[in-house]
């Protein structure tokens, strides 16, 4: 039977919040079986616990933000994407501020941090959300869909009218029975446009944003001196975000995700619509030799 997993030993690091610009200490610790991923705001008097769930999402304008009883944790998607990529089910994540640090703008720092701590199997079967019928949400020309598929595959199309993005590719498909998260997705950085960054800073946001943690573009080109990590890094980062957003369902998904110009808001709307219809999914466990290829040792060696 495939088993639940947590981090083997506690690990800690310090980073900067993308929007607040404030230094944040983050500690990732083992958690009991069936507890899921829970954030703990150690800077609040009650050490408030905020579960990482789809129904806890309260804001999706610039990142995925979750809250409970008015206590917020923002920009959770990159860390949750790393948790999904490493096959982690149960974690306690302590923060001394509201925002998960941006690190280098990808999931790479979180992958390294968790791998350095090690991963421990727990003696309880791992649960999966198996998609039983298509579920789709649309907003204008944007869409996000989950459909039955015995594995985990993402097909994402972006549409940015910019020379640098046009040149690198607007669509990417990744099937995790054939590609590993760490090598194909985990290093893709967030990106933004210089004029948008200026506008955000005037609003008191993006104070921690820099060329060290984002790909920044002006009207014609990429401003970073560093080359792209993937030739189609922009769309791969959108997949990284989507994996983190989808992990708010609480379990790994067995199904296919298709998106056109989707973002945090539509991804969360998709999960909420899925949860509203119990006939659209089921919670299952798998014997190791019966598990989807996307979650097997051969295709995802980091899981083991």
UniProtKB/Swiss-Prot annotation:
InterPro entries associated with the record: Ribosomal_Su5_D2-typ_SF, UDP-acyl_GlcNac_deAcase, UDP-acyl_GlcNac_deAcase_C, UDP-acyl_N-AcGlcN_deAcase_N
GO cellular component terms attached to this protein's record: membrane
EC number(s) recorded for this UniProt protein: 3.5.1.108
Cofactor(s) listed: Zn(2+)
Function of the molecule: Catalyzes the hydrolysis of UDP-3-O-myristoyl-N-acetylglucosamine to form UDP-3-O-myristoylglucosamine and acetate, the committed step in lipid A biosynthesis.
Record family assignment: Belongs to the LpxC family.
Name of the protein: UDP-3-O-acyl-N-acetylglucosamine deacetylase
Gene name in the database record: lpxC
